[in-house]
């Protein structure tokens, strides 16, 4: 009788889940149809006369484009919430480049009020496009009510910077802080079994210590200090002011602010950080005088999103004979398929194989923006880049904000590596982490017991890890580290001894990595394109004049699966909001959430935990 009831209950649960999923899917399809219909009927704003491009970046920058922006915008409109958007850095640069040659576009306006900032390499890339735009004789104006450090860095590329009359410029330097869990694990009686190689492999320190080791701190202080020097130097050159005008020491800063009776707006003016202070109305009058008025009586501007819809799609593929394929590897490298935040080894390998099989593809640019992740998935990706090289297709790596640990593993054997001066790279090291809870469950009166045929059979999380098993894990990790050294040695044409001195988990900034031979050139994505063309022509009797740069993406990803993934992510974020968790608890949850991304089949990771938190 019990079995019958159990079976009936399972059937009812299945029917319930099926009905709920069908209803939800129907709702999603209906909403997509409504969005498509409404956007199809809505005409894109276009300049009817000469005006300026308004670069109103409402959100944060990433390499990959969010294909569900209309969906996200519609949901934001429905629930009345402002949700920051994911904006592709490459779309921004593409729009600026097109505007430079557009006779109707007479200038560029940076509205940075809702821009959430980005890493310095992305800002440098956009800044380079802005500088080129200015060289064409077109003015660039930047405005924000208040400037964060990242917003101001981008604004510094403009001809003129305007600040609201009660605004401020928040430049404070760079810092990085990690959470450490050893005491918490001790209180919970969790035993973390850590197997690693590398003096500076700080990825696992949070589970072994309550503070940062002296070696990790020295390494971080070096590259963080260099990054800050690069920030100050760039702003100084862009604004044509002395470096010591950017940020004085704390004592001098306070003295100047007190002398101005705490007026941070006047302080920004006095330091030469802004051109002038204005009200919003004053700014519109100034822009109207420069670019004319539109039909609404305001300055004649076309918004970034509207302008982008009038341009050819950057992701469009064309039937041309000479292509340079671009493949993005963005986020933590995981085993399996990619999602919105992670780069799946199987997905990236499939895209690279597509470029391999396409005879029109002459070279591949691997765009890497990753702190690493699964050792297995990283090697699957690297093997596909080698397959491209074996058939004569050069592979050029363009590093973004970071290409560390697994991100460097997949880069190291490329034909040529280009990094930004502020790219975080290196972190050559490997680890395995295996926690056991035998003491935790004892505290609540639970015990684990059983039998095994050998000492190696029981790797339960509720039993102590046998010494032979621990020795096996450590031996495999040491082999993994040696393999890392071999790969880098082969790819960079350095001895293993030389690589080992640069390895041990040390993090390097792009400029130092260049000096040490870990990268070939300091430059942007544009230099990667130029190098790809050069390498192709070096291998051919007849030089190719025209190349088509095309982004290769995964054909297997459907809009519905992306929408469902985004909906799930949004629901998780909404749950955190509804719970009303304090900010420190939310930060703790995010830190620990990193562990959920770890899915390597052998539990081996090439990951730089400390590479993405500079603020």
UniProtKB/Swiss-Prot annotation:
CDD domains: S49_SppA_67K_type, S49_Sppa_N_C
Cytoplasmic-side segments: 1-17
Subcellular location: Cell inner membrane
InterPro entries: ClpP/crotonase-like_dom_sf, Pept_S49_pIV, Pept_S49_SppA, Peptidase_S49, S49_SppA_67K_type_N, S49_SppA_C
Biological process annotations from GO: signal peptide processing
Ranges in the topological domain labelled Periplasmic: 39-615
A GO MF term: serine-type peptidase activity
EC number: 3.4.21.-
Signal peptide positions on this chain: none
Keywords on record: Cell inner membrane, Cell membrane, Hydrolase, Membrane, Protease, Serine protease, Transmembrane, Transmembrane helix
Active site: 201, 405
Mode of membrane association: Single-pass membrane protein
Gene Ontology cellular-component terms listed: plasma membrane
Main location: membrane
Quaternary state and interactors: Homotetramer.
Protein name from the UniProt record: Protease 4
Native organism: Haemophilus influenzae (strain ATCC 51907 / DSM 11121 / KW20 / Rd)
Lineage of source species: Bacteria, Pseudomonadati, Pseudomonadota, Gammaproteobacteria, Pasteurellales
């Amino acid at each position: 009788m019990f079995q019958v009831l159990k079976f009936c209950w399972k059937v009812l649960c299945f029917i319930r889940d099926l009905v709920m999923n069908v209803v939800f899917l129907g709702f999603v399809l209906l909403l997509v149809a409504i969005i498509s219909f409404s956007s199809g009927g809505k005409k894109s704003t276009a300049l009817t006369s000469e005006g300026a491009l308004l670069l109103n970046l409402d959100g944060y920058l990433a390499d990959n484009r969010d294909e569900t922006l209309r969906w996200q915008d519609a949901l934001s409109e429905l629930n009345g919430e402002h949700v920051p958007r994911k904006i592709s850095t490459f779309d921004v640069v593409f729009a600026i480049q097109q505007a430079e040659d557009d006779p109707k576009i007479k200038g560029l306006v940076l509205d940075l009020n809702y821009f959430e900032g980005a890493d310095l390499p992305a800002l440098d890339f956009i800044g380079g496009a802005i500088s080129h735009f200015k060289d064409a004789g077109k003015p660039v104006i930047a405005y924000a009510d208040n400037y964060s450090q990242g917003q101001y860095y981008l604004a510094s590329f403009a001809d003129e910077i305007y600040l609201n009359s009660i605004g401020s410029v928040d430049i404070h330097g760079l810092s990085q802080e990690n959470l450490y869990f050893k005491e918490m694990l001790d209180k919970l009686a969790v035993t973390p079994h850590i197997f690693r190689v590398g003096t500076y492999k700080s990825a696992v320190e949070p589970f072994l210590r309550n503070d940062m080791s002296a070696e990790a701190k020295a390494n971080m202080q070096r590259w963080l200090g260099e990054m800050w020097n690069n920030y100050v130097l760039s702003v100084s050159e862009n604004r044509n002011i002395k470096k010591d005008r950017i940020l004085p020491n704390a004592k001098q800063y306070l003295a100047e602010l007190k002398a101005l009776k705490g007026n941070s707006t006047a302080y920004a003016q006095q330091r030469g950080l802004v051109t002038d202070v204005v009200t919003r109305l004053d700014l519109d009058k100034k822009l109207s005088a420069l670019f004319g008025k539109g039909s609404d009586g305001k300055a004649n501007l076309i918004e970034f999103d509207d302008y982008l819809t009038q341009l050819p799609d950057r992701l469009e593929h064309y039937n041309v004979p000479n292509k340079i394929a671009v493949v993005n590897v963005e986020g933590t490298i995981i085993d399996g398929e990619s999602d919105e935040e992670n780069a799946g080894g199987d997905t990236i390998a499939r895209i690279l194989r597509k470029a391999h099989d396409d005879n029109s593809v002459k070279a591949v640019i691997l765009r890497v923006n990753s702190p690493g992740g699964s050792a297995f998935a990283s090697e699957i990706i690297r093997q596909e880049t080698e397959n491209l090289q074996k058939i004569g297709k050069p592979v050029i790596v363009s590093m973004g904000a970071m290409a560390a640990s697994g991100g460097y593993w997949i880069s190291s054997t490329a034909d040529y590596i280009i990094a930004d001066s502020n790219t975080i790279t290196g972190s050559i090291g490997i680890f395995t982490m295996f926690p056991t809870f035998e003491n935790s469950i004892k505290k609540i009166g639970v015990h684990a017991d059983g039998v095994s045929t050998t000492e190696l059979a029981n790797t339960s999380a509720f039993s102590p890890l046998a010494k032979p098993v621990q020795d096996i894990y450590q031996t495999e990790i040491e082999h993994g580290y040696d393999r890392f050294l071999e790969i880098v040695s082969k790819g960079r044409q350095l001895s293993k001894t030389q690589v080992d001195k640069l390895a041990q988990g040390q993090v390097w900034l792009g400029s130092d990595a260049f000096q040490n031979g870990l990268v070939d050139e300091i430059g942007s994505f544009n230099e990667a394109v130029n190098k790809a063309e050069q390498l192709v022509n070096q291998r051919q009797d007849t030089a190719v004049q025209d190349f088509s740069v095309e982004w290769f993406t995964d054909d297997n990803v459907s809009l519905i699966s992306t929408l469902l993934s985004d909906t799930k992510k949004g629901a998780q974020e909404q749950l955190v909001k509804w719970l009303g968790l304090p900010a420190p608890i939310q930060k703790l949850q995010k830190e620990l959430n990193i562990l959920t991304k770890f899915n390597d089949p052998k539990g081996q990771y090439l990951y730089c935990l400390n590479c993405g938190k500079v603020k």
